[in-house]
Amino acid sequence: MSVADQMALIKRGAVEILVEKELEEKLEKSAKTGVPLKIKAGFDPTAPDLHLGHTVLLHKMRQFQQLGHEVIFLIGDFTGMIGDPTGKSETRKALSREDVLRNAETYKEQVFKILDPEKTRVAFNSEWLAKLDAGGMIGLAAKYTVARMLERDDFGKRFANQLPISIHEFLYPLIQGYDSVALQADVELGGTDQKFNLLVGRELQREWGQTPQTVITMPLLEGLDGVNKMSKSLGNYIGINEPADEIFGKIMSISDELMLRYYELLSDLSMAEIDGMRTGIRDGSVHPMEAKKQLGREVVARYHGAAAATDAEEHFVKRFRDNQTPDEMPELTLAATDEKVALCRLLAEAGLVKSNSEGRRAIQQGGVKVNGEKVSDESLELAATGVYVIQFGKRRFARITFA
């Protein structure tokens, strides 16, 4: 494949390539010498399950594998114990070594549903970071100033608002950057929220006399609410280890616009095919539900196999036929919180009933369903995260999104 064709594939879905000309030169050199580029992406095992948001990077890594390059799946077992402060307004709670290692094992099992195990190097950053003594850590810290760290948006805001910033949080970008030095990475992939850290890696490589890595930032996949990035803590995620029926059903619940976004970042369809689908939805020649089914089949098949994808679609169609959930319904957006909210209250706020007491009676009488499942507990409380489709009677629906 020509360098131009490689660049076209690499650029798909990417937000930024720093520096694009450098990447072209690296690809040209690789083609001439036959030496593959080292492509690095790091994942801190702070939770046991990967979700579709993580797979945006994994799909880009797979594309590099298909182009013949070496992919390094870096598990941040050392940095995971620090906790990435990116985007946080307060210091994150550190995980124990045992928690990190347990989560890391599940990561290794899950990533090979996407990556080719024969072409993937799995590395743990404790291999080199645990060997850094006090002198080495001080030497690393000397490479950057506090003023430069405060240029990072989240640190700057916390400092301006007189919120505490722990010293170890300043070390995180340096340690992540040092990973690139240890691996001699040619390219590092990361979400747009990681741009500062990725650029630190470039600077540290220059300090160590290495060719600076090319940085490719990928978008943060929106969760089911279409607003916030996909996150387990927000409840708006699709885990790749979830049952096939749940994955398919969640994909069918997203908006049409978000569906097209998922196609671009998660599917193997070409951009021309996706653009054709977008046009078809606009002119009415493509029904959005059929397009979502196609996406659901592709995603489920990737993680559970083609047979499971077919079964999941059939299960959804039967449930949809029985429930007759409409495409259009009243929508209500509420603030996501850590608290739970009573279902009877949601019925009233969505305008499906006139009062909380009427909502409780409706639940008692078996006239209420949540996401297609009938409920009978009048005291039921729901987590104030994610998306719920609430049905009252046969024809009254509301979609409630916590964002």
Swiss-Prot record:
Residues holding ATP: 232
Domain S4 RNA-binding: 341-402
Residue ranges annotated as motif 'HIGH' region: 45-54
Cellular component GO terms held in the UniProt record: cytosol
Pfam families xref list: SYY_C-terminal, tRNA-synt_1b
GO MF term (any one): RNA binding
Enzyme class: ligase
UniProt key word Zinc: no
Superkingdom of the source species: Bacteria
Record keywords: Aminoacyl-tRNA synthetase, ATP-binding, Cytoplasm, Ligase, Nucleotide-binding, Protein biosynthesis, RNA-binding
Catalysed transformations (reactions): tRNA(Tyr) + L-tyrosine + ATP = L-tyrosyl-tRNA(Tyr) + AMP + diphosphate + H(+)
EC number: 6.1.1.1
PROSITE patterns: AA_TRNA_LIGASE_I (PS00178), S4 (PS50889)
SMART domains on file: S4 (SM00363)
PANTHER family on file: TYROSINE--TRNA LIGASE (PTHR11766:SF1), TYROSYL-TRNA SYNTHETASE (PTHR11766)
Quaternary context: Homodimer.
Family that this chain belongs to: Belongs to the class-I aminoacyl-tRNA synthetase family. TyrS type 2 subfamily.
HAMAP family xrefs: Tyr_tRNA_synth_type2
NCBIfam families according to UniProt: tyrS (TIGR00234)
Function, in words: Catalyzes the attachment of tyrosine to tRNA(Tyr) in a two-step reaction: tyrosine is first activated by ATP to form Tyr-AMP and then transferred to the acceptor end of tRNA(Tyr).
Name the UniProt record assigns to this protein: Tyrosine--tRNA ligase
Natural source organism: Geobacter sulfurreducens (strain ATCC 51573 / DSM 12127 / PCA)
